[in-house]
């Protein structure tokens, strides 16, 4: 008996020892090369799994000889075999699978209109940032990278244009990009507390210009896509239609970014083109043999020159990401997953003048953006229960932003520098010589976010319901020092209306939302119905009671419907047709800058005495300062009303989709002019001399009209258009698919509220704008059209591990016209009493008021059309063995750009080819 027990214990020990040390190797059956990253699982168990290492070897624990294992790898046929210790397993390539690498955006199949861009498409596209992916959307087109300015997003619109169809920037319509929400692994990238700008920019202005300060400023403009690298991204979904009520604080659309969370070999990427150099490293580690504990690490660096011949202006980006994933299950009763990530993103703009051509002086603009983010999420799924899912997401992020500007200020004769912080008459400083001004904007935007969601499900006789209920809260606060500079040496001596401001004194912004949604699926005969209907309630917590939004909730109802008709045969192949439609309201809350703008200091010159004998000592300058608070306590959220209809057709591996959409927003944010009456003294400078008290001089009381900028809901955007996408089956003799995307966009950019407009005409020696300013109820904007297509020939030769795509991008038409204006004001404000008065026929008899009536030539409102243009782009990807991938792209290798006439001038267009090469390594 004792011998029997000993024998059994010995056998058990041998089995356990064997189970702990079983190894194997996986290679390519044709090349005999090791396959890195192949998945090896014990068949019938998800807990026992591993991946092959750099040598193709793997180790399985808790497994015995003869157990059936499954070996799988992308592009190879899966292999189910008995497991033998030390054996070598050969995988055969799956040519069909290799030929189906998706290198374009995939259209959505559900009721919500969206496009999904996968990892393979990103690899083939060779992007510098997520901005480059937008060319894959319907209506998108390839652009040369411009890292010298913020890359903001526009969805389903033409973008603002100039008189001759050129792209412009316009602060009045920045809601387009501000209203696009970017989500990374379920948490948003918030820019609400970003106040990083220069007083020389047009941030708090209704005007826009292409200056250094404006091009790189993203305050109130949303996410700068330059800062988002694609190297650690698994997929990007761009929702252009009506999103689920789960997503809010948006108007235009949604960009959902999913990071890589799986075991992958060490990958390296090197890219170089005419503008940029890029490098990245990434690795996904399986921390246990079961493969359910994963650690992903990524690093990236990019250095871009705005002009390859100019070393004085560049942009740099540094990114790092550490992501942990843990999955578990309990006999299919519940599945859970915990995700955690620590991400760093740094963007660095640097521009300075060449001292050799700037008289030895250096003007410099440096802007740095460093974001640290800690995210956590927990997802619990209970497939067997009516309570299906619990999902919790959290985020804590801090940005360290610094904008430093050095500027040479050279007054013509003298410059007046007001120093007063309060209302009243004060002596001002004068500067008589050039000086170097230094400006610092120190921002520390902080954001915290919590979202909790529950999913329930139940069935009836004919329907299946999935109910989603949840809430989210976020807080945005800026703890920075704000605008720091020497008031005696401002960045400008011309109309300086700013003062230093501490951002940490600004209250926090808190958004709270609650949502509920039912996703119903039903069978009606042979047809299938999908109905997604829900509502989202939005409010701002902790807002001062002086604001009209305080305590108010704004409801966003949204509905999406998909009707899948019965399949029928065409040519012996089944055809499926679905009709989709939706309607919804989306809401974007104001940012910190819109709620708490900088004060405006209006300065009126009471006396400017310049002493010719001793100017620096005896000159005297007096100003009357008015401190304006531009806060609009009646500001409201921007709300967009959207509806669309879409037709999807699938037949024999061919897919066609076309949709028509219309969006209307009349409450977009913009800064508008506010006019009022200002009184000040004008001293008789002719009697002034050194040592005289200026208050004893005779003076004249003056009253003028002047204005400042206040945020309002005065922007109107109306979008409509048609989007189409077609993907053919692969033509096997050519190894090619044909992908066609295109769009017609018609967009109106105008105002939704009457606006003041001043006239500078002089009558009887008096400027009209000082006496009267008209209020006009006109359309001060443009109406734009754009029609373009992108035909891509996707050719893949799996045996050669070669993919090349040729895209023919045609811009068939760009048209723009100024909207007709009624030049007759509806009212005017008078300097006599500061009140609004109706503008009547009798007003035309007054020589001053007559000037307020504008007349326009009909030629101003004629449409201008830019003729058709075409470019051809080429991209090639070649795998070399198991470890290396080479890619090449050449944009605009062929072009058709005919000349055209604009305002009597011949415009000659030309295109400079843009080349780049990339090497990828898998180790």
Predicted segments with their positions:
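Face-selective signature of the C-terminal outer-membrane beta-barrel domain
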Residues: 328-347, 365-546, 721-723
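Short, acidic, small-residue-rich periplasmic hinge/interaction motif at the N-terminus
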Residues: 27-31, 38-43, 72-76, 84-123
């Amino acid at each position: 008996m004792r011998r029997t027990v000993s024998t059994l214990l010995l056998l058990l020990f041998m089995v356990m020892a064997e189970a702990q040390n079983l190894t194997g190797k996986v290679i390519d059956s044709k090349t005999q090369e090791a396959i890195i990253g192949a998945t090896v699982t014990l068949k019938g168990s998800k807990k026992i799994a591993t991946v092959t290492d750099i040598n193709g070897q793997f180790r399985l624990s808790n497994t015995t000889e003869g157990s059936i294992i499954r070996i799988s790898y992308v592009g190879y046929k899966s292999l189910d075999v008995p497991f033998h210790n030390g054996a070598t397993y050969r995988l055969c390539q799956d040519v069909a699978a290799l030929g189906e690498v998706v290198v374009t955006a995939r259209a959505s199949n559900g009721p919500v209109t969206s496009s999904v861009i996968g990892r393979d498409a990103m690899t083939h596209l060779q992007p510098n940032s997520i901005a480059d992916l937008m060319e894959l959307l319907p209506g998108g087109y390839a652009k040369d990278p411009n890292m010298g300015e913020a890359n903001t997003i526009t969805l389903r619109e033409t973008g603002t244009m100039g008189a001759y169809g050129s792209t412009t920037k316009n602060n009045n319509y920045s809601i387009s990009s501000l209203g696009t929400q970017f989500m990374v692994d379920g948490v948003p990238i918030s820019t609400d507390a970003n106040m990083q700008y220069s007083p020389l920019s047009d941030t708090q202005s209704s005007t826009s210009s292409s200056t250094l300060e404006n091009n790189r400023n993203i305050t109130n403009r949303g996410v700068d896509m330059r800062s988002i690298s694609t190297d650690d991204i698994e997929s990007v979904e761009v929702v252009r239609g009506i999103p689920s009520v789960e997503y809010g604080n948006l108007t235009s659309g949604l960009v959902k970014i999913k990071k890589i969370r799986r075991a992958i070999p060490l990958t390296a990427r090197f890219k170089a083109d005419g503008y940029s150099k890029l490098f990245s490293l990434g690795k996904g580690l399986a921390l246990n043999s079961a493969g359910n504990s994963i650690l992903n690490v990524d690093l990236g660096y990019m250095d871009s020159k705005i002009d390859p011949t100019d070393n004085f202006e560049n942009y740099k980006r540094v990114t790092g990401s550490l992501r942990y994933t843990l999955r578990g299950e309990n006999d299919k009763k519940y599945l859970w997953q915990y995700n955690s990530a620590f991400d760093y993103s740094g963007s660095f703009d640097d521009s300075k003048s060449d001292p050799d051509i700037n008289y030895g002086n250096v003007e410099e603009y440096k802007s740095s953006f460093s974001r640290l983010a800690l995210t956590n999420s927990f997802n619990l799924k209970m497939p067997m229960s009516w309570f299906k899912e619990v999902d919790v997401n959290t985020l804590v992020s801090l940005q360290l932003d610094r904008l430093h500007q050095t500027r040479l200020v050279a007054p013509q004769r003298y410059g007046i520098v007001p120093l007063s912080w309060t209302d009243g008459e004060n002596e001002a400083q004068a500067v008589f010589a050039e000086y170097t001004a230094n400006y610092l904007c120190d921002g520390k935007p902080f954001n915290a976010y919590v979202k909790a969601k529950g999913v329930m499900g139940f069935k009836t006789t004919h329907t299946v319901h999935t109910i989603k209920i949840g809430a989210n809260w976020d807080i945005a606060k800026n703890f920075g020092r704000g605008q720091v500079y020497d008031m005696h040496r401002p960045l400008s001596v011309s109309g300086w209306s700013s003062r230093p401001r501490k951002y940490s004194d600004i209250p926090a912004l808190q958004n709270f939302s609650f949502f509920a949604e039912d996703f119903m699926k039903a069978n009606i005969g042979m047809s299938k119905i999908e109905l997604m209907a829900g509502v989202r309630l939005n409010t701002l917590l902790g807002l001062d009671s002086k604001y009209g939004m305080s305590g108010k909730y704004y409801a966003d109802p949204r509905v999406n419907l998909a009707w899948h008709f019965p399949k029928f045969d065409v040519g012996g192949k089944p055809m499926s047709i679905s009709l989709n439609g939706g309607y919804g309201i989306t809401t974007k809350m104001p940012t910190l800058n819109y709620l708490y703008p900088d004060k405006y200091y209006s300065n009126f010159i009471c006396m400017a005495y310049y002493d010719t004998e001793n100017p620096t000592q005896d000159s005297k300058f007096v100003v009357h300062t008015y401190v304006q608070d531009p806060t609009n306590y009646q500001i409201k959220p921007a709300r967009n009303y959207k509806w669309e209809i879409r037709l999807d057709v699938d037949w024999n591996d061919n897919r066609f989709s076309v949709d028509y959409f219309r969006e209307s927003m009349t409450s977009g944010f913009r800064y508008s002019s506010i006019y009022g009456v200002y009184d000040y003294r004008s001293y008789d400078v002719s009697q002034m001399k050194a040592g005289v008290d200026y208050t004893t001089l005779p003076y004249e009381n003056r009253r003028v009209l002047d204005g400042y900028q206040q945020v309002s809901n005065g922007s109107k955007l109306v979008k409509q258009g048609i989007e189409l996408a077609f993907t053919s089956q692969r033509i096997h003799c050519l190894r090619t698919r044909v992908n066609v995307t295109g769009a017609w966009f018609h967009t109106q950019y105008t105002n939704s509220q009457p606006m003041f407009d001043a006239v500078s005409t002089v009558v009887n020696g008096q400027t009209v704008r000082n006496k009267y300013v008209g209020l006009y109820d006109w359309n001060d904007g443009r109406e734009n059209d754009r029609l373009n297509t992108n035909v891509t020939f996707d050719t893949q030769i799996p045996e050669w591990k070669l993919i090349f795509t040729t895209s023919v991008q045609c811009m068939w038409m760009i048209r723009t016209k100024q909207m007709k204006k009624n030049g007759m004001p509806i009212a005017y404000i008078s300097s006599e009493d500061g009140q609004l008065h109706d503008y009547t026929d009798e007003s035309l008899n007054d020589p001053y008021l007559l000037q307020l009536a504008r007349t326009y030539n009909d030629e101003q409102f004629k449409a201008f059309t830019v003729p058709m243009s075409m470019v051809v782009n080429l991209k090639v990807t070649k795998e070399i063995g198991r470890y290396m991938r080479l890619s090449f792209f050449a944009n605009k290798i062929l072009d058709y750009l005919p000349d055209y006439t604009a305002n009597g001038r011949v415009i000659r267009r030309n295109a400079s080819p843009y080349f780049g090469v990339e090497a990828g390594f898998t180790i």
